[in-house]
Each structure stands twice: as C-alpha cells, then as structure tokens.
Amino acid sequence: MSLTSNCAIRFLKPALTALALLAVANFGVTQETKTNKTFIDYFLPTPIVGSLFTNVWGAATVGPRDSKNGLEDETMKQWNYWDGQIIKAPDGKYHLFASRWAQARGHGGWGGSQAVHAVSDNLIGPYVDKGLCWPNDAGGRGHNVGALTLPDGSYAVYVSETRPCEVYVSKSLDGPWEHLGTVTVEGEPRWHASNVSIMVRPDGKFEFTQRDGSIFISDNGILGTYQRQGNSVYPSGIPNLEDPCIWYSGGLYHITVNSWSTRKAYHLTSADGIHDWINRGVAYDPRENIARFTDGTVDHWNKVERPSVYIENGHVVAMTLASIDVEKEQDHGNDGHGSKVIVIPFDGAAMDRDLQPATNSAKK
C-alpha cells in the first residue's frame, strides 16, 4: 500500500466514524420520536357529516360544530346524552349504546338516566335514538352504559354506578334485551362499583376495571365470579382518576383514564392486563386539538369524559367521548347547555405499530 493510501485512510477514518455516529444519532432521534408520541397524537381529523354551525345549542367557546356527529338532541329540548359504546352489526349498521336523561334537569339529572340504543349508517353519525334498551325492566334505568360482543356472537349491555353492575344480553343489537344478572366478586358480597369497563381477553376470560383502577378477572362468564387481582393500577401523583376504558390491541392491554379535575386523560399499557401497567402519557385533553374537522375547524368542549373505543381488524379506529359545553354545575336545564356523545376517528394501527418495541420488550 502506498504512503498516499495510508494518509487517505488516516484522514478518512475519523470522518467515517463521525458519519457513523451521526447516523446512529439520527436513527436514535427517529426512534425516540416514535416512542415519544402519546395517545393524543393519533386522533385523526373528523369528517363533516352535516355542516358546521354556530347557531346550535351550546357555549360559543365550543366553536362551529357538526350536530350530525355522534348522538345528540339537536334541539336540546329533551335529552342530555352521556357514555357511548359502538358495535357494528353484521349488516354494516353501527349501534351506539349510551345513557340519557331529561335536559330540563341539567347535568345533575344524570342520576335518573336510562340506557338507550341508537343506530347510524355511518361510524361518525348521525346516530338516531331508538329508545330505551329495556323499557319494561327497572324503568329502563341505566348509567355508565357499556356494551360488548360475547364469545358466542351474542351481545351484552351493562350498567353501573346508579345500579349494581347489571348485565343484559341479546342475540341481536336491536334487542330485546334480557336481564342476565348481576356481576359478582369473590369475597365481596356487597361489591358495588361505578365506571365499570368490561372486555373479553384473548384467552377467553373476562376482565374488567372500575373507577378505582382495580383489575378483576373471571374464567366463568361475564357475571363471574370475578377475582380481584390486587390494588389500583393507576399511576401515582395524578388526582381524581375515573372513567377507565380497557381493551386489547397490538399485543398489549390498554387503559385510558380521565382525571376529572385536570381535564386530562392518560394512557396505560400492560403486557398481561394485570401487572406492570406503564403510563404512556396524555391520552386526550379537550383544550388540545383532538376534535378537529377535515377543513381545519377545531371544537373545544369544556369537558370530554367516559371514553370508549371502537375496534376494527384488531385496532382502534374511533373513540367516543361524552362531551359537555360548560362546567357541569353550569348546566341547569332549559338554558341552551347540555351534553352529547361525539365520535372522533383514531389511527390505532399506527399507535400499535409504534408501540411494537414496547410490546416486544414486554414479551421477553
């Protein structure tokens, strides 16, 4: 080798080393950017189903909005709506299960809410209220309404808070709904909970969480008896957590949970749905631009609570949120204020893909 070649190598080696370090650094930035994204970054622009109007009920601070999105009383003369869970029927229609109460009673009327069923040809809406789920049982009473498809292909709707966790079942999303029974927990004969969220695990067992963040599992059907799996899985240092929503996607168990006093919600994941729940960061915040339309218009509801996910092909594709235009205590009834259920598209496939490093690490 010539002296010239040796000199060239001596000068090139530092340069090549620097380039290699730069490539590693850039790769690290790319990877970090992916893993630093949180749930809130995967909300998608919402298609405008009707038109955007300002001359509808609600505070001007919400912004121009689409009254055909989700489920609402467009006149705000009858109902406040809350909760919200979507299931797609075999015929392609979308069924939303929610609660409603007389708007004349203001937000404080939620204690007398009833479980209702609404239908739409479009995932985003509008959803048409078809009436009470069980009009001849307990006066249709129900709050914290949730719904899911059971392993045998039938359906369940469940309620909590204003009643013990009662479960109703039907072979059709259109009903009729038959009272199956009350959820039971081993060793807790007086168990009564609110904000119950139930799912079917990949192993066929039933799992639920409740307002306090405890996890319960049953290998004997949706009614249980459930086994409490330990203390709350919520992260410490975040006040007033409620409204957990639990599901499985992308090889991980997920919970979103809302801090009512800060208006922020958080996203937690676990490899087995029981242990080692990790706080992945902010899930949503109504002060951020989560409710943005495809034309760039953004709505800012005062509070968005009671999150629920709609899953297709194993990934979340939309989220429903109970939304109110003012502080709850400022909704007095017959005052042009109230609540509805909104639907926002969500890129769950991208989120699950970006969480794959975490999924693979958890499996080791």
Task: For every predicted segment, state its role.
Residues 1-2, 31:
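Initiator methionine at the very start of the polypeptide chain
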Residues 2-16:
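Bacterial N-terminal signal peptides that target proteins for export
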Residues 2-3, 25, 309:
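Intrinsic disorder/low-complexity segments
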Residues 5, 27-28, 331:
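A generic membrane alpha-helix/interface feature
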Residues 9-10, 25, 30:
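N-terminal non-cleavable signal-anchor helices
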Residues 14-26:
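Bacterial N-terminal signal peptides
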Residues 31-364:
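Carbohydrate-active catalytic/glycan-binding domains of CAZyme proteins
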